[in-house]
UniProtKB/Swiss-Prot annotation:
Disrupted gene: phenotype observed: When this gene is missing the Gabija type I system does not confer resistance to SpBeta in B.subtilis. When this gene is missing the Gabija type I system does not confer resistance to T7 in E.coli.
GO biological process, one term: defense response to virus
Family: Belongs to the helicase family.
General function of this protein: Component of antiviral defense system Gabija type I, composed of GajA and GajB. Expression of Gabija type I in B.subtilis (strain BEST7003) confers resistance to phages phi105, phi29, rho14, SpBeta and SBSphiC. Expression of Gabija type I in E.coli B (strain ATCC 11303) confers resistance to phage T7. May be a helicase or contribute to GajA activation.
Domain notes: Contains a UvrD-like helicase domain.
Gene Ontology MF terms in the entry: 3'-5' DNA helicase activity; ATP binding; DNA binding; hydrolase activity
Assembly and oligomerization: Homodimer. Interacts with GajA; 2 GajB dimers dock at opposite sides of the GajA complex to form a 4:4 GajA-GajB assembly (GajAB). GajAB interacts with Bacillus phage Phi3T Gad1 protein; this interaction forms a 4:4:8 GajAB-Gad1 complex and leads to GajAB inhibition.
Positions of the record's site feature: Interaction with GajA: V147, Q150
Binding residues for ATP: A17, G18, A19, G20, S21, G22, K23, T24
Protein name: Gabija protein GajB
One Pfam entry name: AAA_19
Length: 494
């Protein structure tokens, strides 16, 4: 019923959407419904953290996306607020044609950031990743410029914001200003249980605060999980107090399996696949771990015993936002002969003409020379992002260079399909797999820690979840929870 109510609701909307609940589907459906009802000149903006997510929204909307802003959070404030109105807010000494490469232009204070922009023509960034200069600047411009406020107010009737749990404090402040001062309706969706990026500035407290305290939003909870089978849903919900009421106990658990850690990992896998036959070795099978060295060790041990596992590493680009997806597509094009310029173009938000695609190809082809260097990489990225009118972060340049200058991460850009893979939990966020193995000792849920990481890990599994029970405190905690909740069946031991 909530989904139908969301579509009909004309107010500010806050949606908490658990793993596999179809949050992108409801976001797109709501956009389509609002645009169909809209008989005015107003448009909508749909913003998210990555170009990949924006591209997915744009693709699902199809023709409906035309005339509306579909892109990243950074792209929205830069193209709709900062560039058009910085002169009106701060004077003609401030450039609107600033460059987007930051390099060493990091600073500690807002005033220093303004000086870098004014005198060096560069939109810089704070040295502290938990502070967001671009969003502080955009909010300052709105407060100083009547024209900017009038423009945003007269153009947008609603702004849709994805993955709100990953917003930082400065993003939150700007979005609340749009709602409170400009009276623009907001549709925000997220899941605090999936916030695993606090280390890079995300503040799930912003989202939680709105859930608990705000009276300006009509609040909805999407609890149906269309990804995971019921056994896996029950198990993942057990460890979060707010989701325990969603557990639907079954008479028999078949798809969440506990196995003791009393033998090598290769023997555990043989027991699961051959002796007990609870896993299908001919189907997709993924092992999720917390640390890179742990993944490499497991891969070596398994492959020495005749298995064929590939570790898909989290690359430095996975820690660089918001353009990590686009930069990874560029590397695929450079390092993989099977990946064409048209594959890359398909991942760029917006409809590119044949001429634009050829111009982009010409820029990127400079990276195909045998001996690339830092200077060449810098220049190519500057030219590419200038062409696409996207801001480039110095951390992204550093990460891109690190990946390009070594073969260490090449497997992450291989377009071949591998059945048996090992991921870290952070690199697996947003993905889903048929069969998943996790290790209990990776998660200190019994100390009320790692609960978000545990939730993300368990909800990557669609059909089968295996827990290697190598931590007695973890298993004791499960028993305690089962007794408290009077649950008899949550995991099957073999």
């Amino acid at each position: 019923m909530s989904r139908e109510q969301i579509i009909k609701d004309g107010g500010n909307i806050l949606v908490t959407a658990g793993a596999g609940s179809g949050k992108t589907t409801i976001l797109v459906s709501k956009i389509e419904a609002d645009l169909k009802e809209n008989k005015t000149h107003y448009s909508i903006a749909a913003v998210t953290f990555t170009n990949k997510a924006a591209k997915e929204i744009e693709g699902r909307l199809g023709y409906s996306s035309r005339g509306n802003f579909i892109g990243t959070n950074d792209g929205f404030v830069e193209s709709e607020i900062i560039r058009p109105f910085i002169k009106d807010a701060f004077g003609n000494d401030y450039p609107d044609n600033f460059t987007a490469e930051y390099f060493d232009n990091q600073f500690a204070s807002y005033d220093k950031g303004l000086q870098v922009l004014k005198y060096q023509n560069i939109l810089g960034t704070y040295s502290n990743p938990k502070k967001n200069f671009k969003f502080q600047l955009a909010l300052d411009i709105l407060k100083k410029s009547l024209v900017a406020r009038q423009y945003i107010f007269s153009k947008y009737f609603k702004i849709f914001i994805d993955e709100y749990q990953d917003s930082d404090k400065d993003m939150h402040n700007l979005f609340m200003y749009l709602k409170d001062q400009l009276k623009i309706k907001l549709f925000i969706v997220g899941d605090p249980k999936q916030s695993i990026y606090i280390w890079r500035g995300a503040e799930p407290e912003n989202f939680n605060g709105l859930i608990e305290n705000s009276t300006d939003f009509n609040k909805y909870h999407l609890t149906s999980n269309f990804r995971c089978c019921q056994d896996i849903q029950n198990y993942s919900n057990l460890f979060n107090e707010e989701t325990r009421s969603l557990i639907k106990e079954k008479n028999e658990v078949q798809n969440v399996i506990s196995i003791a850690d009393d033998m090598p990992i290769s023997d555990i896998l043989l027991k699961l696949t051959e002796e007990k036959q609870v896993l299908n070795i001919e189907a997709e099978l993924v092992i999720l771990v917390r640390r890179r060295n742990q993944a490499i060790e497991i891969m070596k041990e398994l492959n020495e015993e005749g298995f064929n596992f590939i570790f898909i590493p989290q690359t430095p680009l996975d820690r660089a936002t918001p353009n990590a997806t686009l930069l990874k597509e560029v590397i695929k094009y450079v390092k993989n002969d099977r990946y064409s310029i048209y594959d890359l173009a398909a991942e760029i938000v917006g409809n590119l003409s044949s001429r634009e695609i050829k111009e982009i190809q010409k820029i990127i082809n400079e990276l195909l020379v045998p001996n690339i260097n830092q200077v060449l990489i810098n220049q190519v990225l500057i030219n590419l992002f200038a062409k696409l009118e996207i801001t480039l972060d110095t951390r992204e340049i550093t990460a891109f260079t690190e990946v390009m200058m070594t073969n260490e991460f090449d497997i992450a850009f291989d377009t071949n399909e591998y059945l048996h893979k090992i991921f870290t939990v952070h690199s697996a966020k947003g993905l889903e797999f048929n069969q998943v193995i996790i290790t209990a000792s990776d998660y200190n849920v019994h100390y009320n820690r790692d609960t978000n990481e545990h939730y993300v890990a368990t909800t990557r599994a669609k059909d089968k979840l295996i827990v290697i029970m190598d931590n007695k405190k973890y298993s004791d905690y499960i028993e305690t929870l089962m007794k408290e909740l009077k649950i008899k069946n949550i995991i099957k031991s073999i």
